[in-house]
Amino acid sequence: MEILIVNDDGIYSPSLIALYNALKEKFSDANITIVAPTNQQSGIGRAISLFEPLRMTKVKLAKDIVGYAVSGTPTDCVILGIYQILKKVPDLVISGINIGENLGTEIMTSGTLGAAFEAAHHGAKSIASSLQITSDHLKFKELDIPINFEIPAKITAKIAEKYLDYDMPCDVLNINIPENATLETPIEITRLARKMYTTHVEERIDPRGRSYYWIDGYPIFEEEEDTDVYVLRKKRHISITPLTLDTTIKNLDEFKEKYGKILCEM
């Protein structure tokens, strides 16, 4: 069995080793390959490097664990992992474990989900796994984050085992694990919430009197009860949202009947 691990937090994210070990414990005969960006790539979505060359370096992450650092995006990591390193589509690709949750329709901006969708696009069973971090100070502390990823990694590996056992009608499983989860934390199947954050723009002035801007926002908690936001943030349960690559409107025939002539007649 071939398993590819990628992320958007970078090759030195502490979650990579924890996930590798959990997968090795669950799938002892698997060949597990880690390919991750050289630098932090959060918020990059499914961007791909088309106009600049990519560098790839082998990196020792632990005593018996090596990975490949790629000077590009998470999507680049998936492509190089499949077509340059493995030379074939792996049985499973796991993107994560992300430092911070990936919820709602805002997953479109996530590098973690971008990599997962890219893997699915090439025919691999694909999982995106993220750990809720409630402290912004910890979320953006990156390599020094004092969080034990062992339990989230074991949860991810257990879900991956079940995912591989069945032919589920989805392209990506988006897993979000609450902070301080245990192996007994309940799991729920959810749908995407509309938003996970409010949107706010902060204007500041540089020493030369020119404006510059930070885009930020505050977490949203009040969403419908069957959404990932509600299940993770209000119920403190693990959320699994099955996703598809095809984002076409669900009721296409109804849309065509109602708006086809309006849109198509010139």
From Swiss-Prot:
Its cofactor is a divalent metal cation. A divalent metal cation binds at D8, D9, S42, N98. This is 5'-nucleotidase SurE. Belongs to the SurE nucleotidase family. Its main location: cytoplasm. Nucleotidase that shows phosphatase activity on nucleoside 5'-monophosphates. It is found in: Cytoplasm.
